[in-house]
Each structure stands twice: as C-alpha cells, then as structure tokens.
Amino acid sequence: MAETLKTRLGSLELKNPILSASGTFGYGKEVESFVDPSVYGGIVGKSISLEPRKGNPLPRTWETASGMLNSIGLQNPGIDAFISDPSYLPRMSAYDTRVVVNLVGDTVDEYVEMARRLDSEAAVDALELNISCPNCPLGGMEFGIDPEATRRLVEAVRENFSRTIIAKLTPNVTDVVPIARAAEAGGADALSLVNTYVAMAVDWRQRRPRQSFSHQAKRKNAPWQSGFLSRSRHEQNPQSNGYPRGNARQFTGCIHRSQ
C-alpha cells in the first residue's frame, strides 16, 4: 500500500482512508467471497449491543425509485458472543486492517459496560458509538439529537476506553454542529457522518409505513453535512454508508476542500 495513502483518525493510523460502513459489511466474513477485508484501512462491524437482538420482523427493506428504505432493528449476537465466537471478533482480528467495533445501547450504562470489556481486547483498535439509529425504540438516536446527552454518553465511554472513539451522528437534526461539538467535548476523537435519514414509503396493499433512508439520494445530503461541519470545526469526519462506483470522491472532496 502506497505510503501516500496513510492517514490518521484521531490517534489511530490507517494504511488508507477507506473504512467499511457499519451495517453494510457485516463483520467481514459476509463479504470475503468477493473482497478481501484486508484491503481497507479499517473495517467497522455491524452494531453490537449488550444482549443479543433479533431485530425487526420481516420484511426489513423496501425499494423506492431513489433509494432503499430499511428497518433492520440492529440484529446482532450480543457482546458475549461477539468477543468469544470465532465468527466475530476473533475472525475480524485476523484481517490485516484496523478493527472498529460499533456499539449501540439503550442506556449509558450499557455503552459503558461494553466499552470496559472491549478495552481489554487487544484486537479492538477503536469504538464507533451508534447514537443515531432511528430504528430502535430506546437509545440510539435518543442520545444523538440532544447535545448534553451526547456529551454525557461519550464522556462516560471515554472514562472506560483508552483508544480511539468515533461518534456516529444522526442527520435528523436541524443543526449537526452542536451535537458534534458535544461529542468532541465528551472526548470523541473523530466523527462518523451520517447514519440513515428518517423517511417513509407506504405499502398501499397493507397500509403500513416503511422507514429509514439510505443510498442514492443520501449521497446528495451527507456531503453537505460533512462539508458544513468541516468548515465549522476543521475536523476529520469519516463518511458513512455504501455508495456505488466513484461517488466516494464527492465525500472526500467536500472534506478536503473545506480545510
């Protein structure tokens, strides 16, 4: 890997600036048949909670003309299985790349307990705090829309985790800057912009809503969030979600142009 691609994310050195987005990449093993996770600067695993979660009932996705609606519900094996099961953290640690563990919880104490346990796992290079998921009844976005709640949560995790902390922010606020500053004040080393947008389509056959938006139209909104915040704080802001072909250039461009 070319030396010129090396970059830093807080105190964490990456061999290149490309990281997988949480939720789109599973835990690495899901994509091994068509891409080697080791080519990335880091892999960000799907969200992990203190206890296992089954996720939302099927169907969980809904295609629209301009993007995909999803309501996965944070299905995951829980922190115990994530640490001990060979399919999860042990397998992620075998890749030649940085390992970022995405955490989600209903309470501050849940985030703290997971951070405390992962601090003793040498394979974990960084935490990404999911304080922005719109598809869960408790926690998640409840923290990420309130600057003070964001600061308290990040601060509590910072006291229990000694390495890099990334706060994953929500776009579903009027102004993301106060949330970003609160995360920074709490001890976050970097920000991940942004989680899915709240959206709704209606299944007219069942008269039911389909929620949470990602993909094509999101790539027109998320660069604005990142560029606006970069101009405000001149921070490194990792982008979130998966995009086809050369669209990633729009994201890196909006950051570098603003600095």
Predicted regions and their residues:
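Context-gated lysine
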Residues: K6, K15, K29, K46, ...
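N-terminal capping/small domains of soluble enzymes
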Residues: M1-V99, V104-D109
